[in-house]
Every structure is written in C-alpha cells, then in structure tokens.
Amino acid sequence: MPKNYIDSRGWKYRVMSGLGENAFKARYQRADHQGDVGWKGLATVPWRESREAAQADLDRLAEKKGWKEWIG
C-alpha cells in the first residue's frame, strides 16, 4: 500500500508516475497548492522503473526527515 507523507510546513509528498511506461519518482506539493496542481519531482531521489522502488526511496527519506504519514 503506497504511503504519502506531510512535513511540518504542510508540504505533501507522494510517489507519482512520469512520462513513459516505467518512470516513477517521489514528488512534493507546497502547502499553498491543492489537488493535482503544483507537484514537483524531488531532486534528492532518482527516477525509478517501478512504483515500489520509488516508494522505498520516499519511505527512507520520510523516516530520515521525521515526516508524518498523510492520508490524502
């Protein structure tokens, strides 16, 4: 089950697909945006060929940074 995260600033983080069939990356959305607007790729993680690998990157980063799980 994919997990989404939120930090102390209200920025949200989740894994999303990119262009192409096998392109996934963790992305963030600033607190002043809602819905599908304003999602940007995290520069600190690479593109991955599977959603699971990208989720593992995000999970490790969230644990390191102390982000909380976000249901959204």
Question: Where on the chain are the PLM-derived regions?
Answer:
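Eukaryotic low-complexity, intrinsically disordered regulatory segments enriched in serine, proline
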Residues: 58, 70-71
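Short, intrinsically disordered, low-complexity terminal segments
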Residues: 20-23, 51-53, 59
